């Protein structure tokens, strides 16, 4: 700890100003009396009511103002010895604080002599009479009002205003009188400066004469009430002589002074008397400014006079014997001044932060001068640079510990003082202050005037009791003193041997002195606080140092910082400063205005420069609780533990992290007596304190690890790794592993909050592995084997480390991983907090083990990821709600090209409690790839079908037109029922697939199904291409149905569970997207639920078929037991005889039933089913009927006890599907009840019994819904759900939407006169004008669309080859077809393969022909007309019957594209249409020709343009056929089409 030096705070400008005021204003005695009253009020106050405590932050600890310098020494008991008298009699003055060992003894002796002469000359002049004797002024004021009553006032906190520079600056303008007096006296300051410089010998002679005079003066002044001019002049002469002889005593004189034990108490008593005997005018004025009220308190004088009168009576006998003793020491003290002065200079050089200030020419010009500083701020609010060699904290600051430390030193040294050196110090102070032109004011805050001497003595005794304990801490401190600057360099070497500290500012001490406590849970490692770097001085306004004590928050304790070193020692301690270790602590000043700083003793420096250059972390001396290594070759390095971890390992006694005794677990895992890890001292720490302390140390380790990781990253960033770099990398990795493992095993909760597990993997392994893998790719074949060997070595190290860490986690936190690998997402009993965090850490270790195994396989160029998959699955079993293991499993699936597994695991990682959001992008890429492959498969199938269509074209008439530029490809559809016939572009594909799916092998069908399944879910996930989702979903259902028919099933139970899980996730994801839309299901969610229910319905249907095929057998009555209510007439099906295919389906059905029980709002009311989907509810009713014949009591299942546990003879029955889907968010709401079975039962049969039980419960729940979907009627279960025809409904809805659009467009192109008539009939002229403008805009839009279609048509006609793929489904006959080929149309309608679309204009023409309206020909043609009329009537009757029976294979179409289900009202106004009736019929055909450029444009540049048509125009009219060919509408006559379609 730095040496503490007592400092003198004096304002020479104030003394000179008051001396001048006495000379000019002789009538200001009354003001001086008032000032003296206030000074005595300050002198008798003691703000330090208790010993300094760093954590308390007492507001009255800082008493460092100039005016209070005298009272500062008086009011603190900690700055002196154990004797209360010594504290009470501390000799100070307004200009000189009590400075042990610096020459204050002379000043004490001078004032201890009786004053005999009170008369001086009538003026103030000469070299020695420049200043007013403040003690004389105090004595005059003390005698002024002896009977004044005492007044108590409320004590204010002195620190709040003392440390506020702004407040002090503003105080200088409050007292105008004092400022004017100082301004008038500035002209006399130079004279004072020149005449106040005296040699030490001359000062000593003058002091002898004044000592004899001073005693008589004080005796007479004590009885005089009002001071006279002579007394004032005598006081001026006395104080000027003492100030002129102020000097600094050397260490040698201090050692000799320690022998004077007999005079110590008297000196202190006389100092107390002198201190309270006088005050200067400036101090009183500043006291008014700080108080803020300007009121005098004369009531305090009485108490002060009483106290000091008593002290004077007891001092007379001891003063006479002091003169010879002091006279004999003058020569010794004078001879030692130069050595002490040069020692101070040497310490200032070592500190390196005391630059010279401008404007001080006499700072280093004479060996008799010392550096000093004026007050902080002058009354004119102008800051001046200055050197401050005094301290406000060693002898007068209540907030510092210097006073306490000084008291300990004085007690050990005997507390000897010398009056002669005190007088010299006073003279030197006058010399130093003489050079200042402005005075700096600083106020002091004290206690109330009611404090008595007895109270002071009580405080002194309390302070003595605590000094014995503090004495040991301050054994290394040096004596304080006033620093002197000397130009004589011959004594620099001698002065360095006794370095001195400077006691000023805030003493920075650790909050706890033992290693078991830490003041800061996470102190910073790098750098020093406050900008105190190496070589930076503390001087200058706003210098490098910052306040450690906030003046705006006086109650907040000061911050702790590490010690600062001098510039000369910077090369030894550069490493220490960089690493931020907790070295020796020292003083740091609280204000920014200081210049220069004495050197601070830092303890032992680092001797190893190589260790410093390597930037290893190391604490100093006993501040290092964990000696982290520097280098193996360094002499200061403790033994280093190489990788792997070799520190002794043991299990702590208790599993708690922070026991109240002494952080047992903090050191337990590493061995209490291991090298480099000192055992902690047992202290009564609470768990909270131990936690704070431990986390503070761990925070240091983590910051150390950050710096080392930075070095490791820098090494890895190099282009090439040298051998030295590799060794350094290995060393850094070993140290990082040690640090991270220590943090994890010490405080697992703190480790989890700081993500230490992931940081360990990323910093120590991942970045190194990735760097070596990159080098392995970039390097040539020569160095590749070496790099691969190093990579494999690192991977092996990682495997060993994480395996060891898993074992240590189990040992430290006392648990077994095997007990928790049960895939329980929610446990009945909560885990211990430490075990919970340890399980999370163990899961991360297993994931890291899997990553290492994966890297090893990739490095060895093999694809056997079985070991990595095993680690990931184990990690998933520990904490199934974490999404990370699923993400890693998805990576393995991508590597092995298992797309369904990859999609499943990515969805699991997204549907976890802590999802991996990056899996969404991975899913997008997988779905995009599935879409691309599905398109390729569809294109290949189309090419195959095209080849088959080209083959028999000659026989079937598939080619129409011999022109090579136009090719028609006709594809014959197979027979399907009209009710289930799909529409759209996929109309002709399903029949083809029906024939092909049965011919495919199981593996090929499985691949096609997986591709279609992923394609459909990709549309649901991305919401792209939803217009083709029904067709894709239908294909998925067809392939899934075909796949279920295979035995054995190519899917398996696991793959089936993945399919069901993907369906649940799609619904879950659609629900998330649809949030905020209310309770109604969105269209996306509706489609996802429909697909999931359809696939579940197929599963139920297949399960019911397998149950019906399973043989039954009678069950004995004694075996039935509680199941005797079952109907056993026809026998029952045992669970043990279930076929294998049924066993494979039961897990998936059970999981989906759990989901339905947990989310009833998703399926009730039932959504619209999809095309190709069975009736799900009817299938469930059939399954319920089949389950009524199943006997599931072969294995008895038991519930848990009331306390949640089963019998010891039972075992928990956990299904594999529950383990697999544990932690899946959509299933968390499903009911999960523990189930137990006997020990000797068959687990597989017991599991099937549980599944059947759950399914029966689910079916009963369907019957118990508010609107039941199943009901038991007539001895069996039936479906109560309303029958839906989703395919027709959805088709009609889509058709109606399209029709509405067409109607709107057609109406715009209709008769303009009709629109104009409507506009003229209603509305004003503005409305008519607006409607006309709208009409023209829409007409323009239609014209643009028509123009675009014309361009497309021109491209088709003038381009390359045109291929038209014809898949007939919609047949549009004209009027001649009904007249000439009515029977053929009847056959086409009866086959149900096609839909007969009758234009309304054709029905209108048939009505006209049936009525004979068009028979205008001659008589010769009458027979033909009657024949036409009869055929027309037959056609009308045919159409009316067909529409009345609501045959789905026939429909009517208006000219505007509207579909009619009835022809009861079939009149249509066609007056506004352009063209004839043939054009209207052709427009109906074009309604089904929805061409899209992206569909028919060729993929290649010169490829053929391919159009798809599902409509065929049936006509014999040549003109209409020509028009149809120009619009690319397929056209055939009815007989030819009947032959091609093989109908009839």
Curated annotation (Swiss-Prot):
Chain intervals with Polar residues compositional bias: 223-244, 976-986
Enzyme Commission number(s) from the entry: 3.1.-.-
Comp. bias (Gly residues): 536-545
Cellular component GO terms held in the UniProt record: chromosome, telomeric region; cytosol; nucleolus; telomerase holoenzyme complex
InterPro entries in UniProt: DNA/RNA-bd_Est1-type (IPR018834), Est1-like_N (IPR019458), Est1/Ebs1-like (IPR045153), PIN-like_dom_sf (IPR029060), PIN_dom (IPR002716), TPR-like_helical_dom_sf (IPR011990)
Pfam families: EST1, EST1_DNA_bind, PIN_4
Keywords recorded for this protein, A-Z: Chromosome, Cytoplasm, Endonuclease, Hydrolase, Nonsense-mediated mRNA decay, Nuclease, Nucleus, Telomere
Region (Disordered): 25-503, 536-573, 936-964, 976-996
Cofactor(s) this protein cannot do without: Mn(2+)
Subunit structure: May form homooligomers. Associated component of the telomerase holoenzyme complex.
Annotated function: Component of the telomerase ribonucleoprotein (RNP) complex that is essential for the replication of chromosome termini. Required for normal embryonic development.
Record-given protein name: Telomerase-binding protein EST1A
């Amino acid at each position: 700890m730095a040496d503490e030096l007592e400092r003198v705070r004096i304002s020479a400008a104030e003394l000179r100003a008051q001396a001048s005021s006495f000379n000019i204003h002789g009538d200001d005695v009354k003001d001086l009396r008032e000032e003296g009253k206030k000074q005595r009020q300050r002198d008798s106050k003691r703000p330090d009511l208790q010993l300094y405590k760093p954590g308390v932050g007492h507001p009255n600890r800082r008493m460092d103002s100039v005016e209070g310098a005298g009272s500062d020494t008086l009011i603190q008991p900690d700055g002196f010895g154990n004797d209360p008298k010594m504290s009470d009699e501390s000799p100070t003055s307004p200009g000189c604080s009590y400075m042990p060992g610096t020459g204050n003894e002379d000043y004490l002796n001078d004032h201890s002599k009786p004053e005999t002469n009170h008369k001086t000359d009538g003026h103030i002049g000469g070299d020695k009479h420049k200043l007013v004797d403040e003690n004389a002024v105090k004595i005059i004021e003390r005698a002024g009002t002896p009977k004044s009553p005492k007044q108590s006032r409320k004590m204010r906190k002195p620190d709040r205003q003392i440390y506020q520079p702004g407040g002090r600056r503003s105080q200088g303008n409050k007292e105008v009188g004092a400022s004017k007096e100082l301004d008038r006296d500035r002209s006399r300051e130079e004279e004072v400066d020149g005449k106040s410089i005296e040699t030490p010998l001359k000062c000593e002679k003058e002091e002898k004469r004044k000592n004899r005079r001073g005693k008589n003066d004080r005796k007479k002044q004590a009885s005089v009430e009002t001071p006279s001019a002579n007394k004032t002049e005598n006081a001026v002469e006395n104080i000027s002589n003492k100030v002129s002889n102020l000097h600094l005593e050397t260490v040698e004189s201090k050692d000799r002074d320690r022998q004077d034990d007999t005079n110590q108490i008297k000196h202190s008593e006389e100092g107390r008397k002198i201190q309270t005997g006088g005050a200067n005018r400036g101090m009183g004025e500043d006291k008014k400014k700080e108080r803020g009220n300007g009121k005098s308190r004369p009531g305090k004088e009485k108490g002060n006079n009483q106290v000091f009168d008593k002290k004077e009576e007891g001092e007379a006998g001891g003063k006479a014997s002091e003169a010879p003793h002091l006279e004999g020491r003058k020569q010794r003290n004078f001879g030692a001044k130069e050595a002490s002065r040069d020692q101070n200079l040497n310490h200032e050089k070592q500190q390196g932060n005391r630059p010279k200030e401008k404007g001080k020419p006499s700072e280093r010009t004479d060996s008799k001068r010392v550096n000093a500083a004026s007050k902080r701020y002058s009354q004119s609010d102008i800051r001046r640079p200055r050197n401050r060699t005094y301290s406000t904290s060693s002898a007068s600051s209540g907030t510092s510990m210097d006073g306490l430390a000084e008291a300990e030193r004085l007690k050990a040294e005997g507390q000897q003082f010398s009056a002669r050196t005190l007088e010299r110090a006073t003279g030197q102070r006058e010399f130093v202050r003489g050079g200042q032109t402005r005075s700096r004011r600083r106020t002091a805050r004290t206690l109330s005037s009611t404090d008595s001497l007895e109270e002071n003595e009580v405080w002194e005794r309390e302070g003595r009791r605590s000094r014995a304990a503090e004495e040991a801490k301050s054994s290394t401190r040096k004596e304080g003193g006033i620093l002197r600057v000397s130009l004589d360099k011959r004594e620099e070497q001698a002065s360095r041997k006794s370095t001195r500290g400077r006691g000023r500012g805030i003493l920075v001490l650790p909050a706890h002195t033992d290693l078991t406590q830490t003041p800061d849970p996470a102190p910073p490692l790098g750098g020093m606080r406050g900008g105190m770097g190496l070589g930076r001085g503390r001087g200058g306004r706003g210098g490098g140092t910052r306040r450690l004590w906030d003046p705006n928050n006086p109650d907040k304790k000061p911050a702790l910082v590490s010690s600062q070193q001098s510039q000369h020692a910077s090369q030894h301690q550069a490493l220490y400063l960089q690493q931020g270790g907790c070295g020796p602590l020292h003083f740091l000043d609280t204000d920014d205005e200081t210049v220069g700083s004495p050197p601070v003793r830092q303890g032992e420096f680092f001797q190893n420069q190589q260790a410093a250059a390597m930037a290893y972390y190391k604490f100093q001396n006993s501040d290092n609780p964990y000696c982290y290594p520097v280098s193996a070759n360094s002499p200061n390095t403790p033994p280093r533990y190489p990788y792997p971890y070799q520190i002794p390992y043991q299990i702590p006694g208790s599993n708690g992290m922070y026991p109240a005794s002494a952080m047992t677990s903090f050191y337990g895992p590493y061995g209490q007596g291991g090298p480099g890890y000192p055992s902690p001292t047992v202290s009564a720490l609470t768990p909270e304190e131990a936690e704070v302390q431990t986390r503070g140390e761990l925070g240091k380790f983590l910051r150390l690890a950050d710096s080392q990781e930075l070095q490791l990253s820098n090494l890895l960033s190099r282009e090439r790794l040298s051998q030295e770099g590799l060794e350094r990398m290995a060393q850094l990795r070993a140290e990082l592993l040690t640090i991270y493992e220590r943090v994890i095993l010490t405080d697992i909760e703190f480790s989890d909050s700081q993500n230490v597990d992931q940081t360990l993997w990323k910093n120590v392994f991942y970045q190194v592995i990735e760097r070596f893998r990159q080098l392995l790719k970039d390097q040539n074949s020569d160095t590749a084997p070496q790099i691969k060997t190093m990579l494999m070595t690192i991977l092996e190290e990682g495997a060993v480390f994480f395996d060891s860490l898993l074992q240590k986690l189990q040992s430290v936190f006392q648990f077994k991983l095997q007990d928790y690998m049960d895939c329980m997402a929610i446990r009945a009993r909560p885990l211990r907090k430490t075990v919970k965090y340890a399980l999370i850490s163990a899961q991360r270790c297993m994931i890291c083990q899997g990553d290492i195994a994966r890297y090893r396989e990739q490095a060895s160029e093999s694809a056997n990821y079985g070991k990595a998959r095993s680690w990931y699955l184990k990690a998933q079993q520990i904490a199934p709600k974490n999404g990370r293991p699923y993400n890693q499993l998805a990576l393995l699936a991508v590597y092995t090209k298992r797309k369904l597994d990859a999609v499943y695991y990515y969805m699991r990682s997204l549907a976890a409690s802590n999802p991996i959001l990056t899996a969404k992008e991975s899913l997008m890429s997988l779905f995009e790839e599935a879409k691309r492959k599905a398109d390729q498969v569809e294109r290949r199938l189309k090419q195959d079908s095209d080849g088959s269509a080209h083959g028999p074209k000659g026989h079937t008439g598939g080619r129409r037109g011999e022109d090579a530029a136009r090719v028609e490809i006709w594809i014959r559809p197979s027979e399907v029922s009209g009710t289930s016939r799909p529409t759209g572009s996929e109309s002709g594909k399903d029949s083809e697939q029906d024939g092909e799916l049965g011919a495919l092998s199981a593996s090929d069908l499985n691949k096609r199904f997986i591709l279609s399944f992923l394609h459909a879910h990709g549309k649901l996930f991305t919401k792209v291409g939803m217009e083709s989702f029904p067709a894709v979903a239908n294909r998925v259902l067809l392939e899934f149905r075909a796949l279920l028919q295979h035995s054995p099933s190519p899917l398996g139970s696991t793959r089936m569970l993945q399919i069901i899980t993907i369906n649940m996730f799609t619904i879950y994801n659609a629900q998330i997207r649809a949030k905020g839309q209310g309770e109604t299901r969105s269209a996306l969610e509706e489609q996802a639920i429909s697909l999931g229910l359809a696939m579940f319905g197929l599963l139920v249907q297949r399960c019911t078929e397998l149950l019906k095929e399973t043989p039954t057998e009678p069950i004995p009555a004694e075996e039935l037991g509680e199941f005797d209510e079952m109907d056993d007439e026809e026998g029952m099906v045992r669970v043990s005889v279930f076929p294998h295919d049924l066993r494979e389906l039961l897990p998936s059905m059970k999981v989906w039933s759990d989901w339905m029980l947990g989310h009833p709002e998703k399926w009730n009311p039932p959504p619209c089913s999809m095309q190709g989907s069975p009736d799900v509810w009817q299938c469930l009713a059939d399954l319920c009927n089949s389950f009524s014949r199943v006997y599931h009591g072969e294995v008895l299942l038991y519930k848990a006890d009331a306390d949640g546990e089963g019998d010891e003879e039972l075992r928990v029955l956990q299904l594999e599907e529950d383990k697999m889907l544990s932690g899946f968010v959509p299933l968390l709401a499903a009911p999960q009840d523990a189930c137990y079975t006997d020990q000797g039962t068959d687990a597989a049969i017991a599991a099937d019994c549980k599944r059947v039980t759950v399914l029966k419960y689910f079916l009963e729940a369907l019957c118990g819904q508010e609107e039941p979907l199943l009901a038991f009627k007539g001895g069996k279960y039936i479906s109560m759900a309303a029958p839906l025809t989703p395919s027709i409904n959805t088709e009609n809805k889509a058709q109606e939407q399209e029709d509405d659009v067409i109607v709107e467009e057609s109406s715009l192109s209709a008769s303009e006169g009709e629109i104009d008539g409507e506009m003229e009939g209603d509305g004003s002229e503005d409305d008519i004008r607006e409607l006309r403008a709208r009409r023209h805009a829409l007409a323009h839009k239609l014209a643009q669309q028509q123009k675009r279609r014309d361009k497309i048509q021109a491209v088709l006609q003038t381009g390359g080859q045109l291929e038209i793929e014809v898949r007939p489904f919609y047949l549009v006959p004209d009027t001649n077809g009904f007249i000439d080929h009515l029977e053929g149309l009847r056959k086409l309608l009866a086959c149900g393969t096609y839909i007969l679309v009758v234009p309304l204009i054709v029905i209108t023409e048939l009505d006209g022909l049936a009525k004979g309206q068009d028979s205008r020909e001659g008589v010769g043609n009458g027979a033909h007309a009657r024949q036409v009329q009869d055929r027309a009537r037959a056609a009308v009757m045919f159409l009316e019957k067909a529409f009345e029976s609501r045959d789905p294979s026939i429909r009517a179409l208006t000219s505007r594209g509207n579909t009619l289900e009835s022809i009861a009202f079939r009149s249509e106004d066609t007056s506004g249409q352009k063209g004839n009736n043939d054009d209207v019929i052709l427009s109906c055909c074009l309604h089904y020709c929805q061409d899209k450029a992206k569909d028919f444009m060729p993929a290649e540049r010169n490829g053929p343009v391919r159009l798809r048509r599902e409509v065929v125009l049936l006509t014999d009219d040549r003109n209409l056929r020509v028009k149809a060919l120009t619009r690319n509408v397929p056209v055939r006559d009815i007989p030819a089409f009947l032959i091609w379609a093989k109908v009839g």
